[in-house]
Every structure is written in C-alpha cells, then in structure tokens.
C-alpha cells in the first residue's frame, strides 16, 4: 500500500504505474458478437455494441475485426493516465459536474466540491468543507472541517481555511479560523484566527466580528437531503 505521506513514494508510484487510456467505443457491425474479457467490458446486442476499457486493448480488437465493423465512435477524457479517477458514487457529499478528483483521496461528510475544482492524489477534504470553483488541491493537501476554499485558490500542503485565489506553499499550515486574502502567497505558517495578505503574506490583524461575518459559511449550501 502506498504511503500517501511520502512525496517520493507518491512520485515513484506514478512513475511505475501502468499508464492507461480509458475509453468508451461504440460500434456497429455485421456478424460480430464481441464478449467481455479481462481487457474490456462489452454491452449491447444485435450488431450494436459498447466497449469500455483501455484503448490499446480495444484498438487491437477493432483492428482484428475491422472487416465486420461498419462504424465506430470513441469517447475519451485522457491519454496514458497514471492515476485513475476517484469513485465517489457512495460519498455523502455534493460533487458538481466538472470536478476532477484523482484516486486515493478522502472526502468528508457533507463536503461540497464545485465544478472545475481539481483534487489530486492523497488529498483530504474535511467534513462540511466547500472547495469552490477552479480551486486546486495538490497531492497530500489537507483541508480541515468547515473550511471554505475560495474560487481559484491553490493549495499544496497541510492547511485550514484560506480565502479566494491565494497560493499556499507545500507544508504550510493555516491555523483554525484564519483568513488568507485574495492573491496572497503564503510561505510561512499562519496563526489561528489571524488575517494575512500580500506577497509574501504578512499578518494584517487578528480576525474581528466584521471579518467573521464576511467569511462565515452558508450552511444551506451543504444540505444534501
């Protein structure tokens, strides 16, 4: 089992993994009755079939049977991918279309992941947290509970609640209740309850009631029922 706390082990896993190109291939054919096998699954009947699996194996089948095939159409969304997408069908979370979530992540209960968000291998999303549009969480990035990661934010380490469009370097921890200003580049740990901004980020003040009102969560958005 891969150690997701070791960046070198993750890199080695990606380097040595079998690269795959997942596809769906729709075919019309005459006098051909393809069957599911270890390399791909087959669905359909009456000379119209869908083949689902790795492109290289399916292409070999198509070439071997090209005289029986009258038409094809291929759907794909990657090429030689090292890490499959995460299967989140059974997560108790709201995940919008267009979110890109790699395998081996953890998604907490009632989390919300918006369209365009990118979550890489080993990332952890806490309960009741929202990952907003086009936010990026790098490998091993950890988002705590009740965090709102703002639109376009970039995270590459262990942290808690940043605001819109900061860049937070790997290994930096943002303390509980802290606010990271838009466009900030965070190179050092941020104390709990503080407000930082700038490039590099500097302490502006400790969070007051006005700042808390601006950054509080809209709980209704996390209702999945």
Please describe what each predicted stretch is.
Residues 1-91, 212-225:
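Terminal amphipathic alpha-helical/low-complexity segments used for targeting or macromolecular assembly
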Residues 61, 158, 206:
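Residues that scaffold the ATP/ADP-binding catalytic core of kinase and kinase-like folds
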Residues 88-197, 201-203:
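Structural signal for interior beta-strand "rungs" in well-ordered beta-sheet cores
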Residues 189-225:
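C-terminal appended segment following the main domain
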